[in-house]
Swiss-Prot record:
It comes from Escherichia coli O1:K1 / APEC. The gene is kefF. It comes from the Bacteria. Keywords: Cell inner membrane, Cell membrane, Flavoprotein, FMN, Membrane, NAD, Oxidoreductase. This is Glutathione-regulated potassium-efflux system ancillary protein KefF. GO terms for biological process: positive regulation of potassium ion transmembrane transport; potassium ion transport.
Length: 176
């Protein structure tokens, strides 16, 4: 099962993430958990989230890039749900062998994330990748949709279909 952990503080304003979710919903075996809808007060149901994760083979963290990082509720979710003794540490093997895909949208162009004037995309992903590895997850190459503020509808739809294709390819490779 593919579990999409969707974290967008302003989902009604996101054309890119909305299209990505619409495409993902057309696949079988996909569950979407919208953190800002489930936990507007940031009071996370840790047991429910761990139960959802236990059913997943692929975990997707989908969100907009915010100040070169993840939204605050996703950070809190990781801190609370990936707990010692469950996700890491003594006896913490619940996530071992599962896969993690970072699916992120950005307002800036791809060149904005090259090494030089701005941090490279590989640099920005390091904390998430390190978290994945520390918890025994298999880190997958990220999916990034850039220039979402200025993309036309056709481009957004094409990128959303590419996202769906990434998920489908993973399903076919791991579940035939």
């Amino acid at each position: 099962m593919i579990l999409i952990i969707y974290a967008h503080p302003y989902p009604h304003y996101s054309h890119a993430n909305k299209r990505m979710l619409e495409q993902a919903r057309t696949l079988e075996g996909v569950e979407i958990r919208s953190l800002y809808q489930l936990y507007p007060d940031f009071n996370i149901d840790i047991a429910a989230e761990q139960e959802a994760l236990s059913r997943a083979d692929l975990i997707v963290w989908q969100h907009p890039m915010q100040w070169y990082s993840i939204p605050p509720l996703l950070k809190l979710w990781i801190d609370k749900v990936f707990s010692h003794g469950w996700a890491y540490g003594h006896g913490g093997t619940a996530l071992h062998g599962k896969h993690l895909l970072w699916a992120v949208t950005t307002g800036g162009g791809e060149s904005h994330f090259e090494i030089g004037a701005h941090p490279g995309f590989d640099v920005l992903s390091q904390p998430l990748q390190a978290t994945a590895i520390y918890c025994g997850l298999n880190w997958l190459p990220p999916f990034a949709m850039h220039c979402t503020f200025i993309c036309d509808d056709e481009t957004l739809e094409g990128q959303a279909r590419h996202y769906k294709q990434r998920l489908l390819e993973w399903q076919e490779a791991h579940h035939g």
